[in-house]
């Protein structure tokens, strides 16, 4: 019950350290703070406010919470109690000692006035067998963790007790969960391979017959065995080259696919029942489905077996998804034999079509040659700037240079537009497309984007110049899996569909379009329909930094000819490819094609204008918002062109420094999970975020649509949305960093969630959240135009060098509010995340450019980029993340908690194409049977059951690598 420390002063043994100040005690990371060993001594001191289920007791702001400290003399002699006192409290003076019970919250004023609080109890004699009871009370004035350290000096002993309370308000209290977290276990049962009895697919899944079928690319058995045994294929130790290109990326894709299989197996269920729904359907309840754990949509299928024996597996297609239920259609005999009392073992699957497209793209990439894959091996080129008259009068010098170079390009190598946040990448692409369309009558242009949202955004911008483009020349290609209702009504006329189901038009119709807009994956439908290599004179890859190299090769490998001009636009310092296998990400799948070009090949690395243009003028952010990311990631080169003007939002939240609209609100909350949902939330931060939003929108000063909330965890998104429902704020967007990439808001509020070192180290090890991922950090803090507010625990934030820089940046400019700041020297940066200290993009960028004139605000101004590059930026994010080996197994059991784990994208906005949707996009097309009966397509059945994967002849034929090449 207590710990004795003899003849020590307070500061020599206190958990508060040398000063009587409570900075931050991480009770979630240190189980000993309230876990006192039994004492051999004569005096026993109880612990006030003991934890409840491992967490501090909750108390409402403004209400008094009390508990006792009992000091019992178990010896046969009297002992002298020198003092009992509060050594330290956080917030300061938030706790009170007393010899009398504090008045209840509903007590009258007289009782409250009669209460006598003490700073200490001194000089008392405690008789043998007697117990002294002292009251410790706290009435919180604000939400968050309240901590107190009490010292008991008795005889020649000193005993310390630490008290914790978590202060809630009505908002955070309403988000309390009564269901403790317990990890849901999936089935681990192994079944002998058996032919799957096919089910009946939904009507909308019957696709057109494509001219060219997609090969299966089944995973070779020996490669599966090698990777599943945790052995590293030799090819991954080789330097990437034309010779091993297909083998190298095929291996990485196999690693990725095996990871996807494993993740889906975690959701398998044993001994479950189904209910008959009407004549044709059986329904299955899937726990976590509402949170998309797993994420299932119409057209997916499950595999079911009777639980009573090792029976044949049956394929059941999903025809409808409702809350936690899926409606399934199996083989007719399965429905006839079904009884509601039957029990089944269920396995979830994912559709392999997009993975097969990726395999195909890298195997065919060899036809592109070194000009695309390894530009350093191609002859140097000298482009002639093509003279043109800007159609958009607002494009700047660098944007005009990029357009002139693109117009002057004659085929490969690719041209790169390196565009940091808010510098107008899309504007540059749109200008180039319009110039090509109007000046080059034979131009056929393909524009690919990383998501449906991004592709629609390109279409939207093109339509602003509709007076220049004939509507019949534009086509927006959609995957069949995309819901008709998700498409903006203004865009429907540019799409091709039948019965509200999107399709790819016939070849002759495709050939007539001058501008085709697609996602990376859907572009494969063009090849499947018969479009040949070289048809497109120009291929634009927008947001190329978000696409893995195999994804970038989907449009390039089959459609890019020798004379095709390829243009990549993106920023390698922002979000990279979505990769689920951490080993595959580390070995190269996490490096985008754009990043490889910029960092590995001298013409791009040195900023040669014949190969690359870097945009440096930011029109989005207030200069104070832009300054830190510019210094950290872009060598201080970015130029803020947004006018520095005060926003009415500044007064709404009491911004301390009106000329510095970056505010850090420090708060000590609590990391929590509930039920079987492994995603994290912090209800204290939710309340603070909602409070800030209410202040901003009070009186209509700031509209809901002008505010965005970024937070890394799905459950935090859900909790914030739930809290906002009470205040009727449907237009306010809350989402992950990925959902805000390419977007902006006048006001951005960031909720970091993490309040314990232990969970932050977990994120750091697996590169989750955004407290350990500098690319997510960069995107998060560059979405705001006028005001950026960060809500988080400063003691956790400071463990990462980037977030610590942001914290100190705010504090140094007098823009910090909340709990006490940690001193600058209190934490060293973790060595567990190793960063490359090369700064500001490609190492060869010349930051000492000569002064140039440019019209930022419609007036002639000048700027000078003669700034030294910072030494704290990074060239890549694929360095190995090391951590304590003994934590690896424990942590890996918790992996599905992250916002970006596969198939777990709950709360995503309907229009957003999240990672799972990337895997699924168009998954029903290119290899299905165009009939209306139950599918007997062996390819589909083959895909449904991983154990049937074989090594068919021709697996590597397309790349010229024989089967033995995998050894």
Model segments located where?
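Feature for long, exposed domains in two main contexts
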Residues: 1-261
